[in-house]
Design a protein with these regions (language model features):
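Helix-coil boundary and interhelical linker segments in multi-pass alpha-helical membrane proteins
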Residues: 27-53, 104-118, 165-177
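Interfacial loop-to-transmembrane junctions
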Residues: 12, 132-162
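Small-residue-rich segments of transmembrane alpha-helices in multi-pass membrane proteins
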Residues: 17-32, 84-88, 151-164
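Hydrophobic alpha-helical transmembrane segments
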Residues: 17-18, 48-53, 92-96, 119-121, ...
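Transmembrane helix-loop-helix
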Residues: 1-6, 44-47, 97-144, 177
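Solvent-exposed interhelical
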Residues: 56-100
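Intramembrane alpha-helical segments
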Residues: 1-40
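Transmembrane alpha-helical segments that form the membrane-embedded catalytic/substrate-channel core
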Residues: 1-7, 25-30, 53-68, 125-137
Length: 177
């Protein structure tokens, strides 16, 4: 039903942006505040955005891919998901951008010297990201085949996030840079 709050957010087309905001700067800033010394009280927005932008985009990709297999049903019921509005071909063409930008946002801090080289372990998500890109390029308009896209996106998000977290956690134990 679209009567509850999630339905209202959907009507306003705010699901993907709210997802990106929640998993982007908001969740990491909360974690950083908890880890900060007592009494600091300052929200580390820049660090939170740097830590959360790539994983937030990967998480938003899961939500985005959850619409491909139900385009006809959504359109028939007046639901205007991004995939319905763009069409499956144009929406599928965005997936390499989601994946590539996720990695760019995670690897740029390494290139700039803000993060240790071990953060490149986020590349563990690359096989799932590549499988998702290949699937959607080939079968974007075949709902029976695209129904697994959300699971591939979830696999990308999980391996990418696990690799990034492990890379950042292992850095003090394995100094490479």
């Amino acid at each position: 039903s679209d009567r509850g709050p999630p339905g209202r957010w959907r009507c306003l087309r705010l699901c993907v942006p709210l997802c990106a905001l929640a998993f982007g700067p908001v969740a990491p800033s909360a974690a950083l505040l908890v880890l900060a010394p007592t009494g600091s009280g300052e929200v580390p927005w820049t660090t939170a955005l740097e830590l959360g932008a790539g994983p937030a985009l990967a998480t938003s990709l899961v939500l985005f891919c959850s619409h491909f297999h139900q385009v006809e049903e959504d359109a028939a019921h007046g639901k205007r998901s991004p995939v319905v509005r763009l069409g499956t071909a144009r929406a599928a063409a965005l997936i390499p951008w989601f994946v590539g930008l996720s990695f760019t946002l995670e690897w740029l801090p390494v290139a700039l010297g803000h993060w240790p080289p071990t953060a490149l372990l986020s590349g563990l998500g690359l096989p799932a990201g590549w499988a998702l890109i290949r699937l959607m390029r080939r079968y974007h308009d075949q709902p029976q085949r695209t129904c697994i896209s959300k699971f591939l996106a979830l696999r990308f998000q999980a391996w990418n996030g696990l690799g990034l977290a492990l890379g950042l956690a292992l850095a003090p134990l394995w100094p490479l840079g």
